[in-house]
Amino acid sequence: MASRVTDAIVWYQKKIGAYDQQIWEKSVEQREIKGLRNKPKKTAHVKPDLIDVDLVRGSAFAKAKPESPWTSLTRKGIVRVVFFPFFSRWWLQVTSRVIFSWLLVLYLLQVAAIVLFCSAPSPHSIPLTEVIGPIWLMLLLGTVHCQIVSTRTPKPPLGTGGKRRRKLRKAAHLEVHREGDGSSTTDNTQEGAVQSYGAGAPYSVGTVFRDLWLAAFFLSGSKKAKNSIDKSTETDNGYVSLDGKRTVKSSEDGAQYHELQCETVGPEDAAWATRTPRSVPAKDTQRKITNVSDEVSSEEGPETGYPLRGHVDRTSESGLRNRKPHHYKKHYANEDAPKSGTSCSSRCSSSRQDSESTRPESETEGVLWEDLLHCAECRSSCTSETDVGNPQINPCGKKEYRDDPFHQSHLPWLHSSHPGLEKISAIVWEGNDCKKADMSVLEISGMIMNRVNNHVPGIGYQVFGNAISLILGLTPFVFRLSQATDLEQLTAHSASELYVIAFGSNEDVMVLSMVLISFVVRVSLVWIFFFLLCVAERTYKQRLLFAKLFGHLTSARRARKSEVPHFRLKKVQNIKMWLSLRSYLKRRGPQRSVDVIVSSAFLLTISVVFICCAQLLHVHEIFLDCHCNWELVIWCISLTLFLLRFVTLGSETSKKYSNTSILLTEQINLYLKMEKKPNKKEELTLVNNVLKLATKLLKELDSPFRLYGLTMNPLLYNITQVVILSAVSGVISDLLGFNLKLWKIKS
């Protein structure tokens, strides 16, 4: 229904726009429709020695983003928590078997507590909030987790969407053959398709004929497919695909690239995996793919989790890469293609497979750097070898350029400028010896990351979270004791009497069971929530360490103390790599997932503060006579401490990265160098001008740190500020006896 309304809007927009057109506008539209189809084209390359503003801003290093809006994710999270057992397959995919079992036990205990509360005899001292409170926390945790894992939501492999994308990919691969010789025929396509099937592949005759028919169909309609692909070559962040293939969005970068490959592996396509070094039985692959969760709502499709992706993605990726060299070898055999290109293609493919086969499930930083540098050098060697033989034919370069994940994720700094070859002279210390070495940006960042990973974090906030979990679990018992007797009379009661008062009953088994179950569920859920906050706190701390070590690079004393390389911004190339390293380190580590956790804590704190202020303004004399108010006060204090920690770390990190005193110091060093070496004054003046421009650019792009959530929208931020601070002002004015304003609207 929504698509029909959208089509109607587009149609009517064009209809009324036709009445406003003049002759000149119609002729211009006809020229625009032709576009670049009839224009002569030749091979071009992006200039690797230039930088984009996206590189300085950091958006070039894009992170994965969810396809669905936050409202849809919130709704799905609530549904998946309420009907937890029915979504067991999804929870198993996005968590682990142990965690799922733990959550299932908590879910069943919570259901049992509700049943016991409704079935227990009415005269008991157990408040409703003691049983209902864990439910709200469970819904919050489920929503947060659903938003965190929302970036890994591939569509079903056997669905219509997957078939449509598979058709587009096959059409795009056929266009590659057409570009190679200009006249690829159906026979060549069919022959290549037959050759791609291995002798030992468990393929049925019907599957072979189906693929042959698909190849012939897409070859006949290749012009139509090419037109549809050409219209969609521009991506969301302004990059244009050079090979005519629709690239993935920058907001989904590498994760979406693997998802597309996972979608192309159906039950019948699983035979490709048997030809790779990381081979798995076709039946196992088929079983794993067909067992994808089918209980998710229809608009999102089943969400394949980490275990499936970690097993199938590498298999499908290796299978697809093994299949493509057969196409190229067959295609270029009749044209006397240089042997160097073919050998280079197989070498690139085999080297990538070797690196993937030895890669563990959780990739370490060292393997990432090694693979990244290796891919860059492999690409450069492929290009140089094939260009020498025949510059018109370069199958290796084209295939690798199309399949390169760094190209797919819009990282021109990583794949175009060859970071493995672009180095700067840096000083390193080995004990008391000072030595000079040529280092790339990846090597410098790798040393910084190793230093951060070796840092031993404190456990203060972990202990604080554990203490708050225990305190919130014991709050109902303390509340009943305080309501029953005064503090002076506690010593007069025996232990058995205190036990009866704390648990609300002595003989009723249902009440005792309900209290114990609520205690276990409450402590467990609160501990999970503060565990997430501790993860966010550790991430913010690592970001601060990244910023600190980055600031130590241009200081000889601090670099030696921190055991990181040291270099000066005395060349334009050094400034470029310094800016690249700065943006790269800012984007390292968890970003959106941690922001989701912090945003949830921020919104929860706002809600708790507002409820507390409303309760204090309503009846502040009997504020502590309600059990939920006790819990709200504890939540408010604990969450405020964590938020203050987040704000402190985030502001300090932004301050470290926005420290223009480094650039000013380097400008002073350049003037000192001009005085000592007048013959290099022109070169040093050029570097000084670039430093001034870099200083202005950083001031232009940098913004102060803000917690995510309502603060992203200025209107909502001002409304929230007015509501919350007005309530706090009213409480303080009521308690102190004079008017006090704590807020001021800012435009």
UniProtKB/Swiss-Prot annotation:
Biased region (Basic residues) positions are 321-331
Q: Where are the transmembrane segments?
A: 98-118, 126-146, 459-479, 515-535, 596-616, 630-650, 722-742
Please note every region of biased composition (Low complexity): 340-352
Q: Does the keyword Transmembrane apply?
A: yes
| InterPro entries the record matches | PHTF1/2, PHTF1/2_N
* Segments forming domain PHTF: 6-153
Query: How is it placed in the membrane, per its record?
Result: Multi-pass membrane protein
Keyword Transmembrane included in the entry's annotation: yes
Write out the biased-composition intervals (Polar residues): 182-192
Keywords on this record?
A: Glycoprotein, Membrane, Transmembrane, Transmembrane helix
Q: Which is one Pfam family of this protein?
A: PHTF1-2_N
Localization in the cell: Membrane
Name-wise, this protein is Protein PHTF2
Which taxonomic lineage does the organism of this UniProt entry have? Eukaryota, Metazoa, Chordata, Craniata, Vertebrata
